UniProtKB/Swiss-Prot annotation:
The active site is at S169, H195, D291. Belongs to the CheB family. GO terms for cellular component: cytoplasm. This is Protein-glutamate methylesterase/protein-glutamine glutaminase 2. It is found in: Cytoplasm. Residues 7-124 form the Response regulatory domain. It comes from Cupriavidus pinatubonensis (strain JMP 134 / LMG 1197). One of its GO terms (molecular function) is protein-glutamine glutaminase activity. SUPFAM superfamilies: CheY-like, Methylesterase CheB, C-terminal domain. The modification 4-aspartylphosphate is found at D58. Keywords: Chemotaxis, Cytoplasm, Hydrolase, Phosphoprotein.
Amino acid sequence: MTAAKIKVLCVDDSALIRSLMTEIINSQPDMEVVGTAPDPLVAREMIKQLNPDVLTLDVEMPRMDGLDFLERLMRLRPMPVLMVSSLTERGSEITMRALELGAVDFVTKPKLGIRDGLMEYTDTIADKIRAASRARVRQAPQAASGTPATPMLRSPLLSTEKLIILGASTGGTEAIKDFLMPLPPDSPAVLIVQHMPAGFTRSFAQRLDGLCRITVKEAEHGERVLPGYAYIAPGDSHLRLARSGANYVAHLSQEAPVNRHRPSVDVLFDSAAEHGGKNVIGVILTGMGKDGAKGMLRMREAGAYNLAQDESTCIVFGMPKEAIAAGGVHEVVPLHSMTQRVMARLATYGTRAQRV
């Protein structure tokens, strides 16, 4: 008996995009488009009639804004939503907000040659729909009504040599925010790979920088890695930890994708194993696939202490599951306890710098 196909509803004001998404999705053996809608008002009725497993949603549409629709949907009928975004600064900012509101992930429309560009994305779109269909959906956050502020964690007396090295993918934008917000201003440096296209990582970093006590920025090639900063790998660039004399520096490159990703978590983790060794705390959060599993094992073998997000708090328990299976993880921790566990672990290292 064959498994039921994933039912997808595509919502986009462009007839061309609706047609291409239908072509891409229906070419896969395990999914089908059960309907298309030109705007959210039509989509609302189709959701009731068709009960889709996954919704693809354009971020900018007439009649009702995609974000307004998403916010209502996640409040009234939470379901897996994959945003379809334009490669523009405005598109990236709206997409970041959509992920905050509960969208599982996003795909980008190419700027030119939409037909060829989208068809090239076939595997990516199909993989993201599969992941979305299995994702644990977050409801839209309620408006702040006396919700407690994120507790301020105090930094133990630390050597500036300590580093937090983090990788994430699907669901990672919100998980990274939840991890970074409690960090104290004098936290060890954090190097981050989140699978995301060029342009979107800048919006992501800016949004986090406005929320966190540490400084959050896109990593720049050759810059010194300092405590109190989080460095996010720019989309379409690998990020490595490197040494320049006694200092840690960020190294960016355009080398071939690894595990189909650039930036790749394995690339960052491998460099941390080589140059950070025992000074590293490794963290792997929610994400699809196995990027980071081999690198986390190498970090462990080099003396790092590694933590993985647990299944119950992951949007997609792919990357943490693979890292655990590979043997690279010391502790499996729910997201809401992750920052505290990392800081507690750092406190056990004491004050003495550990040179590698």
